[in-house]
Structures are given as structure tokens and as C-alpha cells.
Amino acid sequence: MACPLDQAIGLLVAIFHKYSGKEGDKHTLSKKELKELIQKELTIGAKLQDAEIARLMDDLDRNKDQEVNFQEYVAFLGALALIYNEALK
């Protein structure tokens, strides 16, 4: 039986792969794929405008290849975790 943290990490990985590769490289998220992931998997996603998602994509895309790789996605999750932690204080 997997521990809750194992399950949570597995879910984060599975969500990345659920959206990556719908178009182009199956190991990265395009802008369209990232937008869909954010809008469907995060409560705040429905509230974000296209310009905000584009700005987020630009911030996440450290190597400027117009895609978000898994490492960049993990950095995004880390930033989200910090925000959630602050909200709980």
C-alpha cells in the first residue's frame, strides 16, 4: 500500500503526462497543453486570463524553447506549494 506522499507525487507525475504530448513532444507541455492543465486541474485556472497564462508560460520556460519540460513543471509545483503554505499560515 502506497503512502499518501507517494500517491501525491505519482499523481503530480501522472497529471503532467496526461497533458504532455497531445501535440508535439510527449515529454513537454506546449502553451496549449499547459493552459488546459491549469484550467482543468487547478481551481484558480478558470479565473486566469489568456495573457496571464502566457506570462506564466514565459516565466516557466527557463530555456525559452516554447515548451515546459518536466523539470520546469516541477519548479512550478514548488512555487504553488509555497503559495499554498503561505495561505495556510
From Swiss-Prot:
GO terms for cellular component: cytoplasm; cytoplasmic side of plasma membrane; cytosol; nuclear envelope; nucleus; perinuclear region of cytoplasm; ruffle. Ca(2+) 2 binds at residues 61, 63, 65, 67, 72. Its main location: nucleus. It is found in: Nucleus envelope; Cytoplasm; Cell membrane. The keyword Repeat applies. Homodimer; head to tail assembly of 2 subunits. Interacts with CACYBP in a calcium-dependent manner. Interacts with ANXA2 and ANXA11 (via N-terminus). Interacts with SUGT1. Interacts with TP53; has higher affinity for TP53 that is phosphorylated on its N-terminal domain, and lower affinity for TP53 that is phosphorylated on its C-terminal domain. Interacts with tropomyosin. Interacts with FKBP4. Interacts with PPP5C (via TPR repeats); the interaction is calcium-dependent and modulates PPP5C activity. Interacts with TPPP; this interaction inhibits TPPP dimerization. It holds the Pfam family S_100. The keyword Acetylation applies. GO terms for molecular function: calcium ion binding; calcium-dependent protein binding; monoatomic ion transmembrane transporter activity; protein homodimerization activity; S100 protein binding; tropomyosin binding; zinc ion binding. It is a peripheral membrane protein. The modification N6-succinyllysine is found at residue 47. Ca(2+) 1 binds at residues 28, 33. It comes from Rattus norvegicus. Residues 12-47, 48-83 form the EF-hand domain. The gene is S100a6. This is Protein S100-A6.
